[in-house]
């Protein structure tokens, strides 16, 4: 057994709190206006029809409806909310 702590061990032992990013509502789910759909850093997914974008790039529903993830060109994605019929 070591009688000294070892060089690294006293400098370790920290970790940042998780930011809880990612998808909060999936395709086909019904949402109400104001519901958060996606939390992200930067625009991984762009806002589509009836979806707003917050200052931290959080995507949220502007109307009640159904979530649909779509392609925006060849290399981008967008999320839209369409009214549920």
Curated annotation (Swiss-Prot):
Region annotated Disordered, chain positions: 1-21
Keywords of this entry: Ribonucleoprotein, Ribosomal protein
Key word Ribonucleoprotein present: yes
One GO CC term, this protein: cytosolic large ribosomal subunit
Entry-linked InterPro entries: Ribosomal_bL27, Ribosomal_bL27_CS
PROSITE patterns the record matches: RIBOSOMAL_L27 (PS00831)
Gene Ontology biological-process entries: translation
Organism in which the protein naturally occurs: Geobacter sulfurreducens (strain ATCC 51573 / DSM 12127 / PCA)
Gene Ontology MF, one: structural constituent of ribosome
Family under the similarity heading: Belongs to the bacterial ribosomal protein bL27 family.
This protein's name: Large ribosomal subunit protein bL27
Signal peptide extent: none
């Amino acid at each position: 057994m070591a009688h000294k702590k070892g060089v690294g061990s006293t400098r370790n032992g920290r970790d940042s709190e998780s930011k809880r990013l990612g998808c909060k509502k999936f395709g086909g789910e019904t949402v109400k206006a104001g519901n958060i759909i996606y939390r992200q850093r930067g625009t991984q997914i762009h806002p589509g029809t009836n979806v707003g974008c917050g200052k931290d790039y959080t995507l949220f529903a502007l109307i009640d409806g159904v979530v649909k993830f779509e392609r925006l060109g060849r290399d981008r994605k967008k999320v839209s909310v369409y009214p549920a019929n």
